[in-house]
């Protein structure tokens, strides 16, 4: 199992080879396994951010007992979430599906109170689970993924590269917006009738994922 972890602070990507039974990189005290994070994606390549895992560590430590993770990482080509879902970027977790309503409400309140997540979905929108994510960057469309350009790195570049591959463009999945990703993006934009400047803004994201 190949795992890429992006660090928002250092702007670097680390690569790990792990088994499903191993702990996720940066997970402490066996809080989150590779199997739990990969979920039903069935992917042999997954990605996340260091800050996502560290936030889960703090959250789990404060809660003081195991937190069930029903859904986390997913490949955009498999779907199952909204078009610009943070699950595809590896920065989101849907948790607490096994708790009673009262216990889930307590955990939800803790998630809000700790202020360690970028977004905690309103509980009325997720009555049977809690959605938390550690998204980063200013969204190109007001919500969703940030604008990307040459030399961008990280989780959202992985999503871009996967969608380009799904459109039959020859790009590697490495999380780095290099020359091949730039060429593929420009060619896609040209074919889609968009401004082919290689900048992945709102219109390009919507064309790619919606």
Question: Could you describe each region identified by the protein language model?
Answer:
Residues 190-191, 210:
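Short, basic alpha-helical nucleic acid-contact segments in DNA-binding proteins
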Residues 6, 10-126, 130-136:
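Cell-envelope/glycan interface and biosynthesis
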Residues 4-6, 83-92, 97-167, 171, ...:
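Catalytic cores and adjacent binding grooves of peptidoglycan-active enzymes
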């Amino acid at each position: 199992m190949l795992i890429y972890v992006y660090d928002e602070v250092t702007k670097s990507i680390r690569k790990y080879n792990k088994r499903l039974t191993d702990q996720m990189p940066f997970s402490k005290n066996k809080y989150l396994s590779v199997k739990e994070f990969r979920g039903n994606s069935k992917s042999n390549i997954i990605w996340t951010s260091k800050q996502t895992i560290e936030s889960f560590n703090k959250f789990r430590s404060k809660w003081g007992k195991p937190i069930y993770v029903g859904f986390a990482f997913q490949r955009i080509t498999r779907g199952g979430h909204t078009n610009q879902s943070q699950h595809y970027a590896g920065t989101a977790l849907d948790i607490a599906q096994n708790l009673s309503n009262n216990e889930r409400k307590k955990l939800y309140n803790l998630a809000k109170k700790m202020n360690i997540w970028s977004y905690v979905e309103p509980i009325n929108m997720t009555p049977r689970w809690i959605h938390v994510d550690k998204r980063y960057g200013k969204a190109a469309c007001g919500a969703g993924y940030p604008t990307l350009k040459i030399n961008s790195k990280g989780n959202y570049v992985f999503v871009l590269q996967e969608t380009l591959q799904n459109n039959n463009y020859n790009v590697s999945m490495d999380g780095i917006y290099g020359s091949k990703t730039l060429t593929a993006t420009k060619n896609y934009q040209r074919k889609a009738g968009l401004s082919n400047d290689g900048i992945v803004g709102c219109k390009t994201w919507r064309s790619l994922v919606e």
